[in-house]
Amino acid sequence: MAVAPRLFGGLCFRFRDQNPEVAVEGRLPISHSCVGCRRERTAMATVAANPAAAAAAVAAAAAVTEDREPQHEELPGLDSQWRQIENGESGRERPLRAGESWFLVEKHWYKQWEAYVQGGDQDSSTFPGCINNATLFQDEINWRLKEGLVEGEDYVLLPAAAWHYLVSWYGLEHGQPPIERKVIELPNIQKVEVYPVELLLVRHNDLGKSHTVQFSHTDSIGLVLRTARERFLVEPQEDTRLWAKNSEGSLDRLYDTHITVLDAALETGQLIIMETRKKDGTWPSAQLHVMNNNMSEEDEDFKGQPGICGLTNLGNTCFMNSALQCLSNVPQLTEYFLNNCYLEELNFRNPLGMKGEIAEAYADLVKQAWSGHHRSIVPHVFKNKVGHFASQFLGYQQHDSQELLSFLLDGLHEDLNRVKKKEYVELCDAAGRPDQEVAQEAWQNHKRRNDSVIVDTFHGLFKSTLVCPDCGNVSVTFDPFCYLSVPLPISHKRVLEVFFIPMDPRRKPEQHRLVVPKKGKISDLCVALSKHTGISPERMMVADVFSHRFYKLYQLEEPLSSILDRDDIFVYEVSGRIEAIEGSREDIVVPVYLRERTPARDYNNSYYGLMLFGHPLLVSVPRDRFTWEGLYNVLMYRLSRYVTKPNSDDEDDGDEKEDDEEDKDDVPGPSTGGSLRDPEPEQAGPSSGVTNRCPFLLDNCLGTSQWPPRRRRKQLFTLQTVNSNGTSDRTTSPEEVHAQPYIAIDWEPEMKKRYYDEVEAEGYVKHDCVGYVMKKAPVRLQECIELFTTVETLEKENPWYCPSCKQHQLATKKLDLWMLPEILIIHLKRFSYTKFSREKLDTLVEFPIRDLDFSEFVIQPQNESNPELYKYDLIAVSNHYGGMRDGHYTTFACNKDSGQWHYFDDNSVSPVNENQIESKAAYVLFYQRQDVARRLLSPAGSSGAPASPACSSPPSSEFMDVN
């Protein structure tokens, strides 16, 4: 019976015996992937992720050769890898199925793998190495995921088969557990549950000792109860029940054990108390004071102004609170709910609705907020309903208040739709008919299928005009809208911060703030920097540095949009631009990494790893000095600002010791691919993906001499050829030097501590331009509306099919306002998205509090006898403070009863003056038409909700109702 291959520091002994020159390094080459070694690596990763499975995993690794000689299994071809991962039943295109496992893979590593397999060269230096998910974890003790990870930006999802393929081919970083998540089935959608609910289980008599347990949103309360009983070793004959402690400190009994964690509205971090019935038959909770879910004791006798009520932040739910406060201060809609008009219009059978649950939950919230008995309320039930019907709002991540508002208005409309059975309506083009006729027909068709208090209050009508650029065919349609999303005038400039690294080693790096064109190129960045430094743009190279590596080396013609605001951009002064023709210039530009040899341990084997540190360099080396010794001297000169040159006494002291070490280690030269030992760097960060490598001309002029040579001269560091990752985990023949044009400076810890000044190395100076702030002139709201109605050409991704040409055309499109609603919601598009970047526009938009006149924007023939039909007054503003991925939402709103403005910041409410309302944070504006405001103030209008037939008042539409 054969014996499974033993591993030494990750190296198969059987392979090591056949390849003694690689045994020193202690790692397998990429092509070596025998089943025994591969399963051994898998077993080692499993031990770290799940100690309980260690024995089984190791046994599986050994069992491969129990009955036969081990078989060598080569990596499949790159095309085959791509097909197995990206396509087919087992790949990323596989549809989600409830209960199946999917796995998270760090985005940068996956992009590196894509570049590797699409490159077509199995020996490429872009080999991604082991799967490394370190950047996804909050810590490496409990292996908790970071909060706020976004699919497509931070990670990709792979089905189980694809994941196991990648692990079997490339391995998983030592010690890291797989990030396995289940597919759950939610209403109308299946979703990978990246963030399960973490509950804190405690006993009623020992609240200080908790067990943190993860549950799926689809797990039942019965499973939570069974888990708690198991954790606390409850005897089978003992009766138990659960209580949930909410954010206000009150307790809710979990009666129904059949409902899910989602339906019970349990959330991560929530305390679940299990109580056990006492021997006398009573429950301990009978002696506890259980508070009401939404009202504290101090609120019971509180009498305040109706509507002046805060909303508790349940955890990143300020976006929801802001939208709710704005909507709550829409007078006619609030009266509609306070007067129970909605009860007669609830539509429980609408397949597009939510069985009336959203409308009822919102009604309860409005009634509490306008009762005058609460300083603040907890919108716990409402949040649960929203998450139940819109899975994108599940959990407690940041969201957009306008997106929540859009969902809520649509949900309320469908829940309150008076049309119980929607008829089919054929949409017709104008075909030369008068606009008035086509518009009335479009509105009547809309009302045949959509008739609710939301339509009465918020819906208006667009006129859309499309013109074919080839045949001149004109298409006119009229479409309803619920809000206007208006663009902001965007500056064509952007500010980039870069670090300039001069060639003169005496000068420190300089931080610069550059103003460059948004749609410019890398060459524009170099020109802007040249004005500050006096260095010609031809002597600059631009790089994105990430985790001590070159993540990307930019070409001059690449767009600046590929640089994100969070990228660390370094611009290096070199002796001239690199050409692709060998011998075309006298200098060679070499990318250089800094590494430190650090002790590491892998089970019972100790070895030395190499860890990157500091900032990489691009060094110009004269061709006639491009030998290992010449390169060493050039690097000593470039590092001279923070590396101390050894004196003669240091060299004498180190001679004897150096000779001993050389005899012991016999370090091979880079040209033979040797390295003392070079496992994967252990620091966090994705594999580098230098997608546009410049043609560095690393000839064989380095020769085959060893470095450092045997001589009685003290060398501070050794040099090693590496790949773009900064690793040398593959053999490198002299012919491969062109494919690995990177040099690593390897430091021993003692030498680095003695001669390398880390403080000086990290030092830099700020150029005067760093204090520059690009001024942004304010814009008027009317300018945004004008921009909204400007003629635009359709993009290539969204062409229009011309019925005359019978082809898709990039037509011109113009939107005009035809009919305005009672309440006009204006969404300022502050968030800008491109292929490479996302940004928030903090431009100050000046908007009027009163008398916003739309008469110049409405193209429908106007009613001159009633100018109030086109004038609006502001009633609410949703504000957003912060950036793209984080921030805070608040609200300004005018109370319908008192006319006083208030500032709502979650559960805090305070009065404000009108001059405080306008700010750069304004995001969504609510305007009320003046004729509606006047009608609501009249005695007849103040008694109910005039927009609803259920309240015996006709709708205010400019067209007749069609039912």
Curated annotation (Swiss-Prot):
Keyword Protease (UniProt): yes
Biased composition annotated in UniProt, kind: Polar residues: 717-731
Known catalytic reactions: Thiol-dependent hydrolysis of ester, thioester, amide, peptide and isopeptide bonds formed by the C-terminal Gly of ubiquitin (a 76-residue protein attached to proteins as an intracellular targeting signal)
GO cellular component: chromosome; cytosol; nucleoplasm; nucleus
PROSITE patterns named in the record: DUSP, USP_1, USP_2, USP_3
Gene3D superfamilies: Cysteine proteinases, DUSP-like, Phosphatidylinositol 3-kinase Catalytic Subunit, Chain A, domain 1
Compositional bias annotation for Acidic residues: 649-665
Protein family (similarity comment): Belongs to the peptidase C19 family.
Protein name, as recorded: Ubiquitin carboxyl-terminal hydrolase 11
Taxonomic classification: Eukaryota, Metazoa, Chordata, Craniata, Vertebrata
Gene name for this UniProt entry: USP11
